[in-house]
């Protein structure tokens, strides 16, 4: 049974605004949000444009500036409405009206049993029940994103190369909306791949991602998401975090983050 959390939901809806709680706080500043929850708000808004015979196949988020731990508004629009492919765009706006995240969404029509495809032969990660609970060492405190998410290590050793970890939200994305839909759960945690499989020592360097791309070949199911992640970086300061995305029924898609690697002051 899923453990109950006393932490508040990531957001409370207030008219057309979404007011964040401490659960949305990220790792780099107490004044800023983790990128996952506000990105999931955009996914939530995009999903409302998607009909029963279509699926979100790709989401790309550009993080334009740190997302403040303050009320946000979401704006979406249809860029192209096609019979087979639909393109959407969206923006997360801060209280001052500045865009903090811009996103695009590719929606594709789905037709059951339309084509025959070979089964994926990748070995799945150990299931959540067989994976050990763990915490990210570089995130501390009694409140924050790291507490609002449950973490289980399925493969590898944190800080030593590729790692597979199961994540699930302990709190709703939006207050009063339970259960959180699987797509929103996936987007809320996919931004954590670079923290699951770190390329640098977080005590000595930061690894802020400027973007997040999620490509899905099928719709996710359930609340658990596995990030089978690996990160590479260069001494000149650019890194890439990539992950296979799984749910408990199989492979769902892939994610990619572009990282800015910078030494900490005195690091």
Q: What is each model feature region?
A:
Residues 1-267:
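Terminal targeting signals and extreme-terminal segments of soluble enzymes
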